[in-house]
Amino acid sequence: MQTSETVSDTGSTVTLQTSVAGQAAVPTQVVQQVPVQQQVQQVQTVQQVQHVYPAQVQYVEGSDTVYTNGAIRTTTYPYTETQMYSQNTGGNYFDTQGGSAQVTTVVSTHSMVGTGGIQMGVTGGQIISSTGGTYLIGNAMENSGHSVSHTTRASPATIEMAIETLQKSDGLSSHRSSLLNSHLQWLLDNYETAEGVSLPRSTLYNHYLRHCQEHKLDPVNAASFGKLIRSIFMGLRTRRLGTRGNSKYHYYGIRVKPDSPLNRLQEDMQYMAMRQQPMQQKQRYKPMQKVDGVGDGFAGSGQSGASVEQTVIAQSQHHQQFLDASRALPEFAEVEISSLPDGTTFEDIKSLQSLYREHCEAILDVVVNLQFSLIEKLWQTFWRYSPSSPADGSTITESGNLSEIESRLPKSKLILFCKNESIVKWMCNCDHMMYQSLVEILIPDVLRPIPSALTQAVRNFAKSLEGWLSSAMSNIPQRMIQTKVAAVSAFAQTLRRYTSLNHLAQAARAVLQNTSQINQMLNDLNRVDFANVQEQASWVCQCDDSMVQRLETDFKMTLQQQSTLEQWAAWLDNVVTQALKPYEGRPSFPKAARQFLLKWSFYSSMVIRDLTLRSAASFGSFHLIRLLYDEYMFYLVEHRVAQATGESPIAVMGEFGDLNDASPGNMEKDEGSDVESEIEEELDDSVEPPAKREKTELSQAFQVGCMQPSLEGSVQQSLVLNQLHSEHIVTSTQTIRQCSATGNTYTAV
């Protein structure tokens, strides 16, 4: 049964035929207006037009350029030079009008692409445009239609449509609605639609409140904000996710863009992390249940195993774009051994090299796939970890894999190799190369923004490394354990430093982009008495006055130019190059590099102290910049020393890792004759008074004496007594071999 409705429009009558619901839908129709004087010539009748119109009819006033029907948002554009819609192949359909009605032309369109970047596929609708009004007659978008996708920015008409919708529904004032432009554009810049993902409503609203606070905007309430979101991202659904008693409402079908600054916020971990089942319900060491460690410490949502696996894969793929997965493991050197341990052969040496190479490649693959928790199992398998009675009764190592390794290299021979010093050194060098590759994979650029969820996962991974390795090597000789733990400790420390540096870089980036803060920093810096700073620091650092003055001038100039973070990084790199250039190619280069770090830190602390005493308004910004520059200087010096010594940065940092073994030897190596001669030359060239020079020489003798190892047969003795609130008195001129301090008493042995 069919019904008819009549629409009155500026004296014209248009009869609209509607059909019952359930008839087959036809493609969306776009209507173009035809001048009145051509009405009679262009009138054509098509009998099938009665099947075009579904049961829903909506009227829009002529002044309204936008209208809605269900989930469809369609916009009419006033542009004349460009074509609004791209027409695909299809037949033409014409509307039947009354005798005095204005004639319109109907063009079939299967996909509509607007200039604003919104692509829509809809079914069963028609647009009729006339001088008095615009009418949309058609079905709402159902599952049979095409999906809606958004590009980076929406057209102005899309934003106007959302604002007008809110004005009608909530009665917003014109002043308040003018603020919605920035809110809507912020949503489009930071969020995008995607299938199979969700965001907590509270988290998204908290991001919005932070945005309003940073830009000093008046936020709308949560209900109006929800309408804002739905007016921009059409087709969003709401789901209640989480465990019983801890569930929250989520927007399903929306996510944060990968390049959005919101990825660096700490609270993004609540939705960037994979949703997984509670840890106590999982089977230990099941690979796909807990892949990347990102979800450590997060409650699950009770999803099924297939859903968890899909979420894990999607999350892993999202984070892998921030890694450098193309880096391969470098080739290891051959083992150089003079004599084989008893009961071993050269074939066993080759088996050890092959097995350890495969072991390191497996670790690299696990890290590339962000399966951090599996590294513990790899260590346990290689080192034949076999607890007598596991606490949870699970089998930690696979019997098949363990039997294969045991057949290639029995554990008894592995123990013998671990006691050989040549094998220990070879394995340490392999570890340094592997860990350096892992660092470059996880953090290829310390200044590039990294999602906070990935950063936290890396830090949790670094925190667990030493414990995992020590537990897996419980039955291995202590010498090998110390060497391996020292290497993995340097690796963990490097990960912690680089993630902290990255976090500081992103925080400082916002400061360096703020013009008002930069101007305030420059004004406060010009009030600092650098002459007084140099006078106080020169006695400690003994730096060239001209070099310090040049650094001050360059720093102010770079700050005044409002340089970017990358430009500041290039400036700091140039400072390191100029400071260490006199020591290039000399054995004292590592010592000079560390001394430069100390001097840089001392000077910067003096400047910060002056700013503090003056109650500088930009003290917080300077403090943040100082932390970043000190950390980045450490990073640069670390790589310069590694380049000068021909080692990896991990090897440089691991040089002093084993305190029980490395302290005397490394100190003796570091305090070589070249460095001591340089110190003597500096003392001879100085123009200090005799009393001051005598005090310096006494202090130097005391420090050098404390660092010399007590390896000789006879131990020379001297006594340094420190009475309460009295000065130190040296009672003998003999060399102080070893010093130990307890309270205020120093005893020389």
Curated annotation (Swiss-Prot):
Record InterPro entries: DNA-bd_RFX (IPR003150), RFX-like (IPR039779), RFX1_trans_act (IPR007668), WH-like_DNA-bd_sf (IPR036388), WH_DNA-bd_sf (IPR036390)
Function: Transcription factor required for ciliogenesis and islet cell differentiation during endocrine pancreas development.
Stated family: Belongs to the RFX family.
Keyword Metal-binding assigned: no
Keywords, sorted A to Z: Developmental protein, Differentiation, DNA-binding, Nucleus, Repressor, Transcription, Transcription regulation
Subcellular location: Nucleus
GO cellular component, one term: nucleus
A GO biological process held by the record: regulation of insulin secretion
Keyword DNA-binding: yes
Residue ranges flagged as DNA-binding region: 183-258
Protein name: Transcription factor RFX3
Gene Ontology terms for molecular function: DNA-binding transcription factor activity; transcription cis-regulatory region binding
